[in-house]
Amino acid sequence: MRRAIAGDGRGRDGLIQGPVAGLQERTMTQNSSTDATPGGHQLRFAHLERVITAQAGDTLFQSARRNGVRIVGACGGRGTCGTCSIHVVEGQVERSPHAAPGREPAEGRAPKKWQRACQLRALSDCTVEVAPRSLAPVVRADVAGSASAEPLPLDPLVRSLDMSVAPATLTDPAADAERLRRALPGQDLRLDLGALRELPRVLRAGSWSLSARLRGSELIGVASPGSPSLGLAVDLGTTNVAAFLIDLQDGRRMASLAIENPQAAWGADVISRVNHAVAPAGGDELRQAAITAINALAHDLCRAVDAVPADIVDVAVCGNTAMQHLLLGLPVFQLGRAPFVAAAGQGMDVKARELGLAVCPGAYVHVAPSVGGFVGGDHVSALLATRDLWAGATTSLVMDIGTNTEISLIHEGRILSASCPSGPALEGGHISCGMRAAEGAIERVGLADDGSLTLKVIGKKAPVGLCGSGVLDVMAALHRAGMADDRGRLNAEHPAVSVRDGKRAARLAEGVSFSQDDVRAVQLAKSAIRTGVELLLREAGLQSGDIARFIIAGAFGAYIDIRSGIDTGLLPQLPLERFAQVGNAAGLGVQRMLACGREREQAAEIAARCRYVELSTLAGFQKAFMQHIGFDTSMKATQ
């Protein structure tokens, strides 16, 4: 069963399709070649119509990232993933002295053509081509794309009142703030300093009429009469950042937009970023990257609906525990070591300007409550959005699949929650030919009657890589075709499997293969997730067959083939009708918290009901993990 959660607003792999003038374009403008660093070399990306300047000592990957050329680098440029493939068309380069041995670009590409950008430094001006599968996508705001979605509950914490104030005269020269208080009797009005700074100008520009933005008894902003009152909901994911613009006066979803999380420059997974955050200035770099992304999203969304960021009077954000900590500037060193304790877990409200968000001067940011460990506000938001699905069943399981996969088992009112460090492999990260869902990406893989692989390619173009929705399909097809055995070892005797330098790879198409290392990466990811499911069931004294409703959330989860998930052992063998794929539930949940104060209370209650389970402390963890590494031939999807 596939059920689209309202307000998802995303395309494949959680990204709206098409070009955009957003974060990347603005970064391009700010970092044009006219700001050349003395002694630096120019890097020309002709196919992107970009010319940038490489700083002395930077690798090509670092220079590209620093200047807004979004090259995929799942390992953060450490040289271990092989995803930042480039071709130096002209110019001289050298191998960086800090280059680490690592995975080379995917088999099937001429090794002298495609190289790792993170391992090269420019010795002259260069012309560089980025491999299609190594280009991070740009996206376009989806304006009113969720008109058919279920309406949001509407009871916002911020209300806007259009009103008039008695003009000041020589006989009544009372201060502007006092005049406003007179116009709002009984409010015990408190004025935010940012709002007070704007008040004199707005009053006189509007001939003593204005729109007062009130949060309870606090004036958080002023604007001209008739100005929109907007809210911004943000799903701060490890891989992508999605934002939704809501009209707080009628609850309409006005626009949505998603971009790659720029923190990916420091690693695709949470632990890599936690490790970077403990380095000097590392945490501030990551925090600033998140703030820059949110500000860019706010700017582009408002521009799409003829508004300005100052019209955003309330913000709600959800993310996993580490993402929320990094956004708030909270320490994360303690998250990277047992017992993985958060600095704070309750939902909190902070002034947007304290974080550096360019919205209404006195607006607040509501950060969703967390559960514990790495089960953060994004999972609480997903539980909030799906509660009508799981509350009606005796036993339900909610799984939000991503780089960090969160799982909650709900049984007779109890909620057991855990997180699994599944990594980016299932989304196409750390896969030799992995790429985002764009033209040329293989999105579906099947098996023909003659045992050959069948491919469905986005845009019906020649295949250039494999995106997340096809990864599980490949694994299931390789196993069914006999190209991979029950342990995941590729069969060197199969004609579609090649062996090069002792490494095996299954050929999917010209220049696109699935290597033995790719198989192992998927095995580790799917075993981590399945182990989490089984251990939570064991903790509750249940069997997988007891799950009446299996809810799969997340942009990736919306596009996987449930049959492939079962055949590979990622998902338990259940009738297909018990599964519900709901898309970006975290995104819907944070929209609900933005639009309605009662939903924030509901989220806090859900978080309080959850009992966090640290899987690694449970007896049998290692045994269960090893048990699910392989591919059980008895696991077959059933109707």
Show which residues each predicted segment covers.
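Phosphate/ATP-binding catalytic cores across multiple sugar-kinase/actin-like superfamilies
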Residues: A293-V305, H379-T386, Q523-G545
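Fe-S ferredoxin-like electron-transfer domains
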Residues: N31-T34, P97-L230
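Acidic, glycine/GT-rich loop-and beta-edge segments that sit at the periphery of enzyme/chaperone cores
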Residues: G39, W114, E129, R133-A168, ...
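Glycine-rich phosphate-binding loop of actin/hexokinase-like ATP-binding domains
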Residues: L236-T238, A243-I271, Q334-D349, S381, ...
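Immediate flanking context of iron-sulfur cluster ligation sites
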Residues: D58-G82, V89-A117
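Conserved phosphate-binding catalytic cores of ATP/NTP-utilizing and phosphoryl-transfer enzymes
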Residues: A205-L230, G362-S396
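Catalytic phosphate/nucleotide-handling subdomain of diverse soluble enzymes
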Residues: H411, L542-I606
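N-terminal phosphate-binding loop and adjacent alpha-helix
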Residues: P262-R303, H430, I442-G446, A521-L524, ...
